[in-house]
């Protein structure tokens, strides 16, 4: 399973439910689901993101969303296009994004092991500014020994900021399974 950002959480949940079904796991710009990595304040905030998004002006949300996840023009353009599908319906964006954040908080609060029982790789943009992704990935790597590759000059969407490098790492990982 290869998961980027929220997709990495889905991969960890799958691993929790079916621990010996995965042959490999790659988390791209994601973070560990284990409770020990996050603070009470972070969980509290995740549970309230719907309201935060709802009361934040749309143009500010758009700027923070685009600038917060991508460094490259290509990555920023993709994020802008995705967010613009919600232009004029900020409430829908707030509900959807907030719902995902709340589910994430609940998964962390469940305090399940979320152990990866297969070969794994962490990929993270060295300029990732989404939440505390860099801190989480450092700790995840140090505690579990899962190898980590830092993508130079990439943000939270390192697969759009440096697609050739991310694809090369994925191909190498799969070739070594």
Question: What are the language-model segments listed below?
Answer:
Residues 1-3, 28:
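Short beta-strand immediately N-terminal to the catalytic nucleophile in serine-hydrolase-like folds
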Residues 3, 7, 11:
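Gly/Ala-rich beta-loop-alpha elbow adjacent to hydrolase catalytic centers
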Residues 36-41, 134-136, 161-163:
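Short aromatic-enriched loop/helix-cap "lid" or pocket-rim segments at secondary-structure transitions
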Residues 120-154, 160:
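Conserved loop-alpha-helix segment in the C-terminal half of the alpha/beta-hydrolase fold
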Residues 160-172:
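Post-His helix in hydrolase/transferase enzymes
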């Amino acid at each position: 399973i290869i998961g980027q950002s929220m997709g990495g959480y889905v991969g960890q949940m799958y691993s929790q439910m079916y621990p010996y079904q995965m042959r490999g796991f790659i988390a791209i710009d994601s973070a560990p689901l284990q409770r020990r990595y996050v603070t009470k304040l972070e969980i509290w905030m995740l549970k309230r993101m719907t309201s935060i998004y709802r009361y934040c002006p749309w143009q500010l949300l758009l700027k923070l969303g685009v600038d917060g996840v991508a460094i490259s023009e290509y990555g920023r353009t993709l994020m802008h296009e995705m967010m613009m599908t919600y232009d004029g319906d900020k409430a829908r964006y707030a509900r959807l994004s907030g719902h995902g954040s709340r589910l994430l908080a609940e998964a962390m609060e469940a305090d399940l092991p979320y152990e990866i029982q297969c070969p794994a790789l962490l990929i993270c943009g060295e300029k990732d500014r989404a939440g505390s992704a860099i801190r989480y990935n450092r700790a995840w790597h140090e505690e579990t020994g899962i190898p980590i590759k830092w993508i130079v000059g990439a943000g939270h969407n390192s697969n759009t900021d440096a697609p050739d490098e991310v694809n090369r790492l994925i191909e190498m990982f799969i070739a070594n399974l």
